[in-house]
């Protein structure tokens, strides 16, 4: 017989996922109304890197339609992040200390802000460097010209944006792992070399196989890992304070 509390947790999880999914769908529908303008903005780094006479193309008749659908889904995800993070918080909140529950709004704002900052950093600073390098590398031989598919470009862009967004979530993740007692700043400091290796592995998996793209992911990862050590130290202190307050209340 399935425990009643497990059924309640699963029902709560289903409800939270439905709300988060509904917010994502609504965001995607709103963004689809502006999908062509969004694609012009998203493709700007590549179009600026293309040599004269080259342009984005579509290979299949349905490619523009599905490209705009995928772009709307990605933009809708970014737009609905505050709702998604709020639902995540609402699901885990019953197991937290009263003092930790007060972190709801900071968690939602910080998580959404960090993901947005990562996407903004990738798009504004890394995309121009990466696509300029890739296009110049591919066209350095005189008889080769660039003719890039809009669908392939968007797929690569989405992977990069998600990668930068997730990497910038590292301090938030470490903060809560510290609050739960899973890691501490001493443990993180002892594993700097492992983190450096992991940074390049993540860069190799999520980016094109060129050194510029991999360094663009690995560099922020290493910097944010050092930031996470400081965050872990602060999180450990606050966790001890919260535990003391809970014991005093009892």
UniProtKB/Swiss-Prot annotation:
Keyword terms: Cell inner membrane, Cell membrane, Membrane, Protein transport, Translocation, Transmembrane, Transmembrane helix, Transport
Gene Ontology MF terms: proton motive force dependent protein transmembrane transporter activity
InterPro entries in the cross-refs: TatC
GO cellular component terms attached to this protein's record: TAT protein transport complex
Pfam family, one: TatC
Membrane topology: Multi-pass membrane protein
Presence of the UniProt keyword Transport in the record: yes
Signal peptide, first to last residue: none
Localization (cell): Cell inner membrane
Sequence intervals crossing the membrane: 19-39, 73-93, 107-127, 133-153, 160-180, 211-231
Alphabetical GO biological process terms: intracellular protein transmembrane transport; protein transport by the Tat complex
Subunit composition and interactions: The Tat system comprises two distinct complexes: a TatABC complex, containing multiple copies of TatA, TatB and TatC subunits, and a separate TatA complex, containing only TatA subunits. Substrates initially bind to the TatABC complex, which probably triggers association of the separate TatA complex to form the active translocon.
Family from the record: Belongs to the TatC family.
PANTHER family, per the entry: SEC-INDEPENDENT PROTEIN TRANSLOCASE PROTEIN TATC, SEC-INDEPENDENT PROTEIN TRANSLOCASE PROTEIN TATC, CHLOROPLASTIC-RELATED
NCBIfam families the UniProt entry points to: tatC
Record's function text: Part of the twin-arginine translocation (Tat) system that transports large folded proteins containing a characteristic twin-arginine motif in their signal peptide across membranes. Together with TatB, TatC is part of a receptor directly interacting with Tat signal peptides.
HAMAP family for the chain: TatC
The name this protein goes by in its record: Sec-independent protein translocase protein TatC
Taxonomic lineage: Bacteria, Pseudomonadati, Thermodesulfobacteriota, Desulfuromonadia, Desulfuromonadales
């Amino acid at each position: 017989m399935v425990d009643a509390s497990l059924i309640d947790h699963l029902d709560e999880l289903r409800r939270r996922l439905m709300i988060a999914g509904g917010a994502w769908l609504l965001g995607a529908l709103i963004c689809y109304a502006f999908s062509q303008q969004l694609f012009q903005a998203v493709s700007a780094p590549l179009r600026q890197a293309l040599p004269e006479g080259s342009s984005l193309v579509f290979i299949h008749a349905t490619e523009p339609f599905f490209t705009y659908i995928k772009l709307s889904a990605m933009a809708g995800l970014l737009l609905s992040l505050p709702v998604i993070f709020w639902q995540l918080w609402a699901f885990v909140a019953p197991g937290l200390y009263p003092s930790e529950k007060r972190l709801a709004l900071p968690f939602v704002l910080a998580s959404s802000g960090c993901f947005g900052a990562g996407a903004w950093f990738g798009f504004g600073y890394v995309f121009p460097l990466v696509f300029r390098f890739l296009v110049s590398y591919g066209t350095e031989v005189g008889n080769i010209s660039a003719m890039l598919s809009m669908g392939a470009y968007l797929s690569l862009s989405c992977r990069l944006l998600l990668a930068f967004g997730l990497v910038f979530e590292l301090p938030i993740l470490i903060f809560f792992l510290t609050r739960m007692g899973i890691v501490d700043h001493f443990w993180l400091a002892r594993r700097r070399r492992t983190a450096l290796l992991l940074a390049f592995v993540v860069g190799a998996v999520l980016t094109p196989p060129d050194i510029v793209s991999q360094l663009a992911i690995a560099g922020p990862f290493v910097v944010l890992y050092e930031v996470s050590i400081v965050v872990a130290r602060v999180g450990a202190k606050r966790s001890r304070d919260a535990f003391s307050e809970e014991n005093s209340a009892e």
